[in-house]
Amino acid sequence: MVLSPADKTNVKSTWDKLGGHAGEYGGEALERTFASFPTTKTYFPHFDLSPGSAQVKAHGKKVADALTLAVGHLDDLPGALSALSDLHAHKLRVDPVNFKLLSHCLLVTLACHHPAEFTPAVHASLDKFFSAVSTVLTSKYR
C-alpha cells in the first residue's frame, strides 16, 4: 500500500505528538490485543500476561520502537524492517493475521488517548501505515 504525501504527513505528525508515550501506548495496545484476541497469547507462553505486566509493557515498547523506526523510513519500509520481517517469518513464525489484530488495537489505543487529533483523515492514514508495516513484516513468509 502506497502512502500519499498527506498520509506521510499525518503519520509523522501523529507520531510526533505521542512524544514519550509511544512505549506506553504500545504496551496498552498489546494488552488490548491479548484481551480481545486470546489466541494471540500463544506466542508468549513465557510471559506474565496479566494486566500491567512488566513483560507486556517491555514488549509493547519494542513494538513502538519498531513503529518509530518505520515512521522515520516511510519511503523504505522494507529496508527499515527487513530484520524484523526475517525474525517474525523464520524464527517466531507469527501468523500474519496477528499483525492486523495488533494494528486494530493500536488504532483504538491512539484514538482513546488522542480523540481530538484522531480525525477520519488521520485514522485512514494510520490504518494505511499499519497495513503497510504488516505487509512488510509478512513479506518474507512467501
Curated annotation (Swiss-Prot):
| Keywords tagged on the record | Acetylation, Heme, Iron, Metal-binding, Oxygen transport, Phosphoprotein, Transport
Residues forming the Globin domain are 2-142
Query: What single Pfam family name could you report for this chain, choosing any that match?
Result: Globin
Q: Which residues carry this modification: Phosphothreonine?
A: 9, 109, 135, 138
KW Acetylation (keyword) present: yes
Q: Which GO terms describe its biological process?
A: hydrogen peroxide catabolic process
Tissue distribution is: Red blood cells.
Acetylation among the record's keywords? yes
The N6-succinyllysine modification is found at 8, 12, 17, 41
Question: Matching PROSITE patterns, A to Z?
Answer: GLOBIN
What is its biological role? Involved in oxygen transport from the lung to the various peripheral tissues.
Q: How does it assemble?
A: Heterotetramer of two alpha chains and two beta chains.
The protein depicted here goes by the name Hemoglobin subunit alpha
Whichever gene encodes this chain, its name is: HBA
